[in-house]
Amino acid sequence: MPKRDDIKTILVIGSGPIVIGQAAEFDYAGTQACLSLKEEGYRVVLVNSNPATIMTDAEMADKVYIEPITLDFVSRIIRKERPDAILPTLGGQTGLNMAMELSAAGILDECNVEVLGTDLTAIKKAEDREAFRDLMNELGEPVPESDIIHNLDEAYTFVERIGYPVIVRPAYTLGGSGGGICHNEQELIETVTSGLKLSPVTQCLLEKSIAGFKEVEYEVMRDANNNAMVVCNMENIDPVGIHTGDSIVVAPSQTLSDREYQLLRDVSLKIIRALEIEGGCNVQLALDPDSYNYYVIEVNPRVSRSSALASKATGYPIAKLAAKIAVGLTLDEVRNPVTGTTYAHFEPTLDYVVAKIPRFAFDKFEQADRRLGTQMKATGEVMAIGRSWEEALLKAVRSLEIGADHLLLEEAENADAETLERKICFPEDDRLFFLAAALRRGQTIEQLHAKTKIDLFFLYKLSKTIELENRLKENPQNEEILAEAKRAGFSDAFIATCWNIDEQAIYDLRKAQNLFPVYKMVDTCAAEFESTTPYFYSTYEDENESIRSSKESVIVLGSGPIRIGQGVEFDYATVHSVWAIQQAGYEAIIINNNPETVSTDFSISDKLYFEPLTLEDVMHVIEIEQPLGVVVQFGGQTAINLADGLAKRGVKILGTSLEDTDRAENRDAFEKALEILQIPQPAGKTATSVEAAIKVATDIGYPVLVRPSYVLGGRAMEIVESEEALKHYMTNAVKVNPKHPVLVDRYVSGQEVEVDAISDGENVLIPGIMEHIERAGVHSGDSIAVYPAQRLSEQVKNTIVDYTTRLATGLNIIGMLNIQYVVDGEEVFVIEVNPRSSRTAPFLSKITEIPMANVATRVILGENLIDLGYTPGLAPEKQEIFVKVPVFSFAKLRSVDTSLGPEMKSTGEVMGKDVTLEKALYKGFVASGTTMHDYGTVLLTVADRDKEEAVELAKRFNRIGFTIMATKGTASTLEEAEIPVSQVKKIGENQETLIDYIRNGQVTLVVNTLTTGKRPERDGFQIRRESVENGIPVCTSLDTAEAILRVLESRSFELESMNASEVKQPKARV
């Protein structure tokens, strides 16, 4: 069936900011789709609010709109661009929900726009819990006994009939938002209330819990001719009850018999055909381990996180082909880009095993509830490929970057019996390590199976790994056992620990017996057909399939799994660096392990190695490829941390030298450099003990900013106001010693400014200066950034340009650098210099049209800025105003304090642009999910230090018609200033308290700067959490509140009566 020629323009809806449940996989899918549609000759219009994505690059579509994905803005784009069709199935839950909203509002009919891929009826049947259940009943496919509920009373009725436990699944939500397993009435009340609030149609499915069944997923494709095929089947190691995004997953499934596999395959194909989906679809099934009984859990009628994993696991580009199917092409017409000879309807065959392990942010959120359930909590994931499950699993473990290079975690090994039991029976993010610890202590696989319902096959494989550990320890330097351990995925570092020698000695032993990995190709067909994909994984076998080319090559290290502090921004820079290397005439090679990202799409680089980012794994690739050098600037802290080990092994680090990187990152060396350059910084010193830290703080005066050296995302950073708080920080937050010093600085509460620059060693280009709306003390990644800076004098700007130029040349930076300053009056202090790409680089690249990672890479390869056509100094500022607004995932992470400080908490970002700051901010807030009410009630409860400032804010809120509510202390201050205020009771007082007002929806905005404590029992913590749980915007910085207020003021009108007697009264605005 030829592609459709009755449509010319297609609107692709992106997925918006990165949040838990919807990460970089949709940048990968959207990028593939846009390129695929352009390849077929269609005019592509894209809307997405996330500037940190490749898909929002100008080259990806004919028209790119970085605008809020809301009904209002998408409708405007449709009316302006007049597309013939929209493709919403590549924008995750955001894209699907937007399509449903556009349809319900009549926009699609009004503008005569067709929905491609999956029609709205199919979306409704899959997403609406009631319609889905009805369809399964029609097909005769079993679903767990369930009921659709719209309120708590209906939930009670269902539980009375079925009994506990029950699973709550809200309709039209992402990553299981608001859902969970309920074992008692208290859990039922909490989960159902939260689920109904988060569901856009106020609907939840309550179903009988089938926790303990095997969870299996099928990734399927179908075209308009009703051809359907399975791309990949995947098995969750964790049984039903844990969200698939939080589960360890293996592909292909390992424990299904052929009969079970075919049974579930047939069901999946039957469902995609019944829904008449044209494109990709994910079917989740539950299989009774003791019979052939199964249940259909749910269907995602779109490209998903699992599609990205299936694409990378098989090499089969699902999103690219789904876009082609959406425009009428069929599976038997489209060639498989991997083989170039077979067609897309051939089902991929794997002759290897793939392991996926989720990456969580609990290192950032120590207070978070780590218990896993049906609501997703992981921020990212890693994937590894091996010839056996054991090998793939161990490679995935060391890809996680959690300080473990094996199934060995200190906390698990040192845990008492009670903790060990709890961690095994009630799964948390680190259960895998506790299972290994239990096996080391002699628990049997049968005992562990009874407690966890994890299949005996996986537990047996774990026990074999532990057995091999013991044999290693008993036979030091035994060549046969060394070879066996390497085949099973053991790292040199772990073997060295077993044998009590250093890692280099293991490498030397392997070298002596020529024990090195070979690289195998991912080809979708188990080598049945000729394939030319440059996509490889390592394993300890005989035949090597990766042949070094005659062309000079450069290796770029990726940034690994997405986590808070190191997000998709670094993948963006990695991809641009690869493109620049190719433009400069070299072969570009990527090493990375994140299945969600664009960088691990094999068509991006000349060669892709899907490997852990450890010294050992990276060195093996370097030894086989013999590159000109390695680029570490774009892979975040992951890549920077490898530079030292690589250099010691004789590898050339391209760009800024290791010594100069250390001068920027090592506190004492940095201070010396600043002294020579005569650039001021806030007073401070390095401390290597608790006593030293107290002395430094006493000398410079409180408050002080404390943080460990060499961190990303403000890990363990805090503003400390007293000696007692400092002692608590030093003993709880960090392990201070001479090897890991702590920096203690005077805290300057000024205006924070951020600069990204590129240096070729002589010339320095500054694309832009960004100012932060929140004052210093809030992590730059959590601040609203504004470009061009609005509040800086010309003198301050000139100083910043001067300091940036001097720092770049003085530190011998070659490539990119990011500098953070604090401005106090007309004084400028440098806070820190990062000699690498930053999380603001994609934002600044988009708005200044200077492709920073591309230019920096050309400079790293030896070109200079002037020859590349750039004038040194600050680039001319744009007329429009751009803002970068952070996006948080607090709703997914219960028990986490939402207050902002020096440690980063946001998972993603959006951009707003317009002709005024207020309009740009409005777009940014709306795109980030902040509800902007033009009137309502503001709850103010602020610390004493903020009361004076709060009075001014309250006056302005009152003037535009908002009601002010405040707790006793704040209310008294406002009354003294003659501002109308309703006093509300604090938590714990009798009668209705402020928490009741928040829960009852009587508050539209909360401004809370009350307590800095992290303990959940603190009032401020409870106020902030309740606000998040109830979808109410909460500002923990008066600067953010002022920004929202500016927007609201700009949207209000003057209202003044004509009575002469009232003319002298202050003007009211609404």
Curated annotation (Swiss-Prot):
Residues involved in Mn(2+) 4 binding: E832, N834
Pathway: Amino-acid biosynthesis; L-arginine biosynthesis; carbamoyl phosphate from bicarbonate: step 1/1; Pyrimidine metabolism; UMP biosynthesis via de novo pathway; (S)-dihydroorotate from bicarbonate: step 1/3
Oligomerization domain: region residues: 402-546
Details of cofactor binding: Binds 4 Mg(2+) or Mn(2+) ions per subunit.
A single GO BP: glutamine metabolic process
Binding site for Mg(2+) 4: E832, N834
Requisite cofactors: Mg(2+); Mn(2+)
Protein task: Large subunit of the glutamine-dependent carbamoyl phosphate synthetase (CPSase). CPSase catalyzes the formation of carbamoyl phosphate from the ammonia moiety of glutamine, carbonate, and phosphate donated by ATP, constituting the first step of 2 biosynthetic pathways, one leading to arginine and/or urea and the other to pyrimidine nucleotides.
Similarity remark: Belongs to the CarB family.
Comment, domains: The large subunit is composed of 2 ATP-grasp domains that are involved in binding the 2 ATP molecules needed for carbamoyl phosphate synthesis. The N-terminal ATP-grasp domain (referred to as the carboxyphosphate synthetic component) catalyzes the ATP-dependent phosphorylation of hydrogencarbonate to carboxyphosphate and the subsequent nucleophilic attack by ammonia to form a carbamate intermediate.
Protein name: Carbamoyl phosphate synthase large chain
